[in-house]
């Protein structure tokens, strides 16, 4: 069965400007600008109201999979709005049984060097995605803090760090060493 029209709206806060260029959404906020291209999805995007403070996503004559893209786009736009207002922060903790993992931040937080992982001499270097800054936490031992506006870039950078510390040729149930995401949140606290 085909649904004639499925639509959802996203409310845009006062301190955020949103603009459409075809199916490319550009969100401007206090922390910066994010843009995202939805050209590969066949939907209609439109701004409603006099002040253009509501984004509507329409999908005509879609099957079940195509209708799911409506909510997906809304979620992506909400994440962009959250990113340019509050920013995203991921915290990662080093876990080790014997050899302490030594993490050094290079190039103003854009390069992470991991040394002494499982006592290895090899230095693992992980470059952060553009727009993501990494720092060593002052409050907590063995903690990395990743901050940025784009949730996909921040989470992807965290994944790259976690994948760099995979244990090879050992039983991973026993060898739990690595750097893992311990907390996901925002840079600024939401006023709620």
UniProtKB/Swiss-Prot annotation:
Gene Ontology BP annotations: cytoplasmic translation
Listed InterPro entries: Ribosomal_uL6-like, Ribosomal_uL6-like_a/b-dom_sf, Ribosomal_uL6_a/b-dom, Ribosomal_uL6_CS2
Cellular component terms per the entry's GO annotation: cytosolic large ribosomal subunit
Location within or outside the cell: Cytoplasm
Modified residues (N6-acetyllysine): 121
One function term, GO molecular function aspect: rRNA binding
Keyword annotations from UniProtKB, A to Z: Acetylation, Cytoplasm, Ribonucleoprotein, Ribosomal protein
Family from the record: Belongs to the universal ribosomal protein uL6 family.
Oligomeric and partner information: Component of the large ribosomal subunit.
Purpose: Component of the large ribosomal subunit. The ribosome is a large ribonucleoprotein complex responsible for the synthesis of proteins in the cell.
UniProt name for this protein: Large ribosomal subunit protein uL6
Upper lineage: Eukaryota, Metazoa, Chordata, Craniata, Vertebrata
């Amino acid at each position: 069965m085909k649904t004639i029209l499925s639509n959802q709206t996203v409310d845009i806060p006062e301190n955020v400007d949103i603009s459409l260029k075809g199916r490319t959404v550009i969100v401007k906020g206090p922390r910066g600008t994010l843009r995202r291209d939805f050209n590969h999805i066949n939907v209609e995007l439109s701004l409603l109201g006099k002040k253009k403070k509501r984004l509507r996503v329409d999908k005509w004559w879609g099957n079940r999979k195509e209708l799911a893209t409506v909510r997906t786009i809304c979620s992506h736009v909400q994440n962009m709005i959250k990113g340019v207002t509050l920013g995203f922060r991921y915290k990662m903790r080093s876990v080790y049984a014997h050899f302490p993992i030594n993490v050094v931040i290079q190039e103003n937080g854009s390069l992470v060097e991991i040394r002494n992982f499982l006592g290895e001499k090899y230095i693992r270097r992980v470059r952060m995605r553009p727009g993501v800054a990494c720092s060593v936490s002052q409050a907590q031992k063995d903690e990395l803090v990743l901050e940025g506006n784009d949730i996909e870039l921040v989470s992807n950078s965290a994944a790259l760090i976690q994948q760099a510390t995979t244990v090879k040729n050992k039983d991973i149930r026993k060898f739990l060493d690595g750097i893992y995401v311990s907390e996901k949140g925002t840079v600024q606290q939401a006023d709620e």
